[in-house]
């Protein structure tokens, strides 16, 4: 598994993501602040999020510039 740091500005949420859990963003942001970014986002080769929308939103809320990602083929 190859983990790369990717700029948040280059990552795109999946438009039809069925989960709408914005209430979890604050807690995930607190966890990232305390423990660091432990689980990378999974994105496709076009940098669209496959898994990790809440982590993406939490990272944005923390002002992070890039996040660890696994690029799925």
Describe the residue ranges of each PLM region:
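Short, charged/polar connector segments at secondary-structure boundaries
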Residues: 1-73
């Amino acid at each position: 598994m190859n983990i790369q740091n990717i700029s948040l500005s280059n990552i795109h949420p999946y438009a039809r993501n069925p989960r709408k859990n914005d209430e979890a963003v604050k807690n995930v942001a607190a966890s990232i602040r305390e423990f660091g970014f432990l689980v990378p986002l999974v994105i496709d080769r076009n940098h669209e999020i496959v898994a990790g929308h809440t982590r993406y939103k939490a990272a944005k809320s923390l002002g992070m510039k890039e996040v660890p990602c696994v690029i799925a083929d």
